[in-house]
């Protein structure tokens, strides 16, 4: 396997290349304003690590407003400038002026042209918003406006055409002609989503579903890019040394656990951007993440499986065979099911939108342990199930079993999750201690 050096999303203790030891693989997860690494052994507090990485990074509030916008009372104020708000725009309660300003800034790249004559910390109000565009854009982002919610001119044009087509009366049917109307393609999704006829005839994604899919795919891309930039500090895979030596075995184990930490952090970052997740209470957020993380990791592993080489590639170019997994300390009883599941997922041929929707459905599983509001979780899951059903019927209208096959993979993941628990127990018997974040999210009690 290739073994370039790599990096964690959160710096490892020591601010240098990690060594193949237990403490070196522990992530440094800082609270806001905290400058020092947590002391060794600080993993004892319940859910401390998960709570910190769940905190919104760039917002003054604890939770972002997600999902359907609540009804306006008529006296709400813009979160950016304090003027009268007209509704929720780009995920934030704001006025028409700030809505239009944020859209123009994103579409026309205004951030690169704006400048502040002051210190970059101008206070925003209805007067000052016209004086300093840079600080106004900064305040928009601090309030929670999201660039991925802004549609391009082409996407808006397609939506207008689609809306006009929906308002027009349907043309008279001519069965003898054999022609069929194709559903409109979703902006931001592959053209394959509009192909086909037969059972998929007349099915279209709603505007809300299109936006949902765009947001999920964009969020995944953003999280993946962050992981790619985090390579340099992962413990290098040992090359040239005696593969059976104790140091080499420890180094391989450290390498894999650090990749797992990157994956966990990527999953948490993605979950925070899934519409509806931050509406849940903190306890339910933690419960859902603890239960779903390993299953999402396995989905992402399957996504990176190469059926020709029978290897799995993490980040940019970390490629691993079955033997590499075994050399890192994993058991054959866990490795073989991973590769079997990856091959099965490969045969389904999911695209980015389908993977993103399937992961969102997995996150909102109401039957997870310790969930306080299962009915609310189930309600949040339903739109993603409906979007995936419509999307698959549009993409593969002749394959009526595609959607149920996808959902059955979530059942397979439950079995794999149980096998993973046995693997973690086996690692403990081998006296291989997991880093605090992994111990906490997988409920490993030392």
From Swiss-Prot:
Q: Where is the NR LBD domain?
A: 208-446
Provide the residue span(s) of the region labelled Disordered. Answer: 1-69, 160-201
PANTHER family recorded for this chain? Answer: NUCLEAR HORMONE RECEPTOR (PTHR24082), OXYSTEROLS RECEPTOR LXR-BETA (PTHR24082:SF316)
Please give the chief subcellular localization of this protein.
Answer: nucleus
Stretch list, region Transactivation AF-1: 1-76
Q: Which parts of the sequence are annotated with region: Transactivation AF-2? A: 205-446
Task: Mention one GO biological process in which this protein takes part, according to its record.
Answer: negative regulation of cold-induced thermogenesis
The location annotated for the cross-link Glycyl lysine isopeptide (Lys-Gly) (interchain with G-Cter in SUMO2) is 395, 433
Query: Could you give a GO molecular-function term held by this entry?
Result: DNA-binding transcription activator activity, RNA polymerase II-specific
Protein's UniProt name: Oxysterols receptor LXR-beta
Q: Which CDD domains match?
A: NR_LBD_LXR (cd06954)
Q: What organism is listed for this UniProt entry?
A: Rattus norvegicus
A GO cellular component annotated for this chain's UniProt record is: cytoplasm
């Amino acid at each position: 396997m290739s073994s370039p050096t790599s990096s964690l999303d959160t710096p490892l203790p020591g601010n240098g290349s990690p060594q193949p030891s237990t403490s070196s693989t522990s992530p440094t997860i800082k609270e806001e304003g905290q400058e020092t690494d947590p002391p060794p052994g600080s993993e004892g507090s319940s859910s401390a690590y998960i709570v910190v990485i769940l905190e919104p990074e760039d917002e003054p509030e604890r939770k972002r407003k997600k999902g359907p916008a609540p009804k306006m009372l008529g006296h709400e104020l813009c979160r950016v400038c304090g003027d009268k708000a007209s509704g929720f725009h780009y995920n934030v309660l704001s006025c028409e002026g700030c809505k239009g300003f944020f859209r123009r800034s994103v579409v026309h790249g205004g951030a690169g042209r704006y400048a502040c004559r002051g210190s970059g910390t101008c206070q925003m109000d209805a007067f000052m918003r016209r004086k300093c565009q840079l600080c106004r854009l900064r305040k928009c982002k601090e309030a929670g406006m999201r660039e991925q919610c802004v549609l391009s001119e082409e996407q808006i044009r397609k939506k207008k055409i689609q809306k006009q087509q929906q308002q027009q009366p349907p043309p008279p049917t001519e069965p003898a002609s054999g022609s069929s109307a194709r559903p409109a393609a979703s902006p931001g999704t592959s053209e394959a989503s509009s192909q086909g006829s037969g059972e998929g005839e007349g099915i279209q994604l709603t505007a809300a579903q299109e936006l949902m899919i765009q947001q999920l795919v964009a969020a995944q891309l953003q999280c993946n890019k962050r992981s790619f930039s985090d390579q340099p500090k992962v413990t290098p895979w040992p090359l040239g040394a005696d593969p059976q030596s104790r140091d080499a075995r420890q180094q391989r184990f450290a390498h894999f656990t650090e990749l797992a930490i990157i994956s966990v952090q990527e999953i948490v970052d993605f979950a925070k951007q899934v519409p509806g997740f931050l509406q849940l209470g903190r306890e339910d957020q933690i419960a859902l993440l603890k239960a779903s993380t390993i299953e999402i990791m396995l989905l992402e592993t399957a996504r990176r499986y190469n059926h020709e080489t029978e290897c799995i590639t993490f980040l940019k170019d970390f490629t691993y065979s079955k033997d590499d997994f075994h050399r890192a300390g994993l058991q054959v009883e866990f490795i073989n099911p991973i590769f079997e599941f990856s091959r099965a997922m490969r045969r389904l041929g999911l695209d980015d939108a389908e993977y993103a929707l399937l992961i969102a459905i997995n996150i909102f599983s109401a039957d997870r342990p310790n969930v306080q509001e299962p009915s609310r979780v189930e309600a949040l899951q339903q739109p993603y199930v409906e979007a995936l059903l419509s999307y698959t019927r549009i993409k593969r209208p002749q394959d009526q079993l595609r959607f149920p096959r996808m959902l059955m993979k979530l059942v397979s993941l439950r079995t794999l999750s149980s096998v993973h628990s046995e693997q973690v127990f086996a690692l403990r018997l081998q006296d291989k201690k997991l880093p605090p974040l992994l111990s906490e999210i997988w409920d490993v009690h030392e």
